[in-house]
Amino acid sequence: MELHFLGTGAGVPAKKRNVSALAIRFLERNGTVWLFDCGEATQHQFLHSPLSLAAVEAIFITHLHGDHILGLPGLLSSRSFQGAETPLDIYGPKGLEAFVIQALETTKTKLRFPIRFHVLAEGRIRDEEKLSVDALALDHPVESYAFRIKEQDKPGTLDAEALKAMGVPPGPLYAQLKKGETVKLADGRIVNGSAFLDESIRGRTVVIAGDTAPVKAMEAFASGADVLVHEATFASNKKDDAHLYGHSTIADACALAKRAAVGQLILTHVSSRYARNENEYRDEAAALLPNVIIAEDLFVFELEKAGRKKRD
C-alpha cells in the first residue's frame, strides 16, 4: 500500500506545494488507486508520478472548498480521453454531484465511463471483501469529513505439520480449517481449525482527515491507526486563527496522534505563508513528535504488510 502525496499545500498553489490531493495505490489489488481530494492541477501531478488515471477506482472528497475539488472535472475528462471505461465511484458531501455534472455539461464533456455518486454521511460508506471505509464528520465552515481505510484481519498460518501428525490429510478440508472452522473427519473425529492457526495478522489502517479544527471524536476514530494523515495548516503560534477558520495547528495534530496512539503521523495542508522558510515549522513538529513526517509534493510513503512501513 503506497500513499502518494500529490498536493500538500493549503488554499492556493505555491511553487513547491500544489493544493490538496492524496492517492493510495493498492499493490495487492493490481495497482488500483483511490484518490482523496482533487485540487486544481491534480492530473498534472499524476504525470510526475507512477500513477495512472485509468487505475483510479474511487475518489473521496473531504469537503467542497475549491482547493479540494477544482481539479476534478479536468481529471475526469482526461481519464475518459485516455480510454478508461471502467465505472468510477465518487464519494463527497451533498452538492458534489451537481458541481461535477454542471462542469461536464458546460464544457460539453462526454465520459466513456459511468460515475456512481455517493453522498457522504457518518459511518460505513464502502464495504468490500477485504477493505472498508468509514467517514467521520469534522469541524470546518463547510461540511467536512475524515476517512478511515481499514483492511480486514488475515487468518494466521495453518499448522499443516501438526494436522498431518494427527492423520489429517492435506486437501479441501485444510481450506475450511484455515478459516477457523470446525470439521468432521471421515473417521468421526472433530477438528477445530482455530486450534491450529497462528495469531491472525492485523489489517492495516489509514486515517485521512479533511480540513478541521480539533474534534474530540477523532481520537477514537483514529485509535491505533498505522498512519494518520492530518492537516496542520498553521504553526502553533497561530492557534486562534487556525481554530477560527476551522483548521488545526502542528500541536493539535501531534497531540491527537499521541492520544490515539497512531503508528505514524504525516502532516499536510501546509499554509503558503511558510513557503519561504519552513525551518521553524519543521522544528516545531520535530520537537513535539520526533518521528513526524511533513509531507511534500510527490512524497511516497509505503505501508507494508502487517503494519511494517518505509518511506521514500
From Swiss-Prot:
Cofactor note: Binds 2 Zn(2+) ions.
InterPro entries named in the record: Metallo-B-lactamas, RibonucZ/Hydroxyglut_hydro, RNase_Z/BN
Cofactor field: Zn(2+)
EC number(s) reported in the record: 3.1.26.11
HAMAP family: RNase_Z_BN (MF_01818)
Membrane-spanning ranges: none
Function: Zinc phosphodiesterase, which displays some tRNA 3'-processing endonuclease activity. Probably involved in tRNA maturation, by removing a 3'-trailer from precursor tRNA.
Protein residues bound to Zn(2+) 2: D67, H68, D211, H269
GO molecular function: 3'-tRNA processing endoribonuclease activity; zinc ion binding
Protein name per the record: Ribonuclease Z
Hydrolase found in the keyword field: yes
Keyword hit for DNA repair: no
Catalytic site: D67
